[in-house]
Amino acid sequence: MELNEKIKRIGGRPSVLPTEFVEALVAFKMNYWKIDDMRLGFDCYDPNDEKNEKRIEIKYSTGRMDYSSFAPKIEWGILNFVKFYNESPIECYFEVYDIGIDMIFEETEKFGRSVYEGYGRRPRISISRELIERGIYRNKKEFSLF
């Protein structure tokens, strides 16, 4: 059961985790450096990446549906998408999906869309539905919150 579904069953409102918390959590678990300068256009830096894709953008979801948009100028090479789950009362775990920017461009262009701004607005894509559920990612890692 997903975290938001469990919260909804007990009469609560869906969870929205602070972005800074999610970015710091992923940085800690993945051994990244957390970047706190928004002007740089990415969230984390991987000092151990040998492919030279060291700049990482973090997006997340606590429910089934997610809609993400991207800055007009993309400064990163890897997207880490985080899905949070709550399977039991004592353990909350999450998955981190590693998606290359080239994969995002290829998949959105197949459907005649773009991640870049058009008609004065940024397009929104569902990373879960349009990429992850279709197996469009490089790697998946699972972690426990506690």
Describe the predicted segments one by one.
Residues 1-55, 59-146:
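Nucleic-acid endonuclease domains
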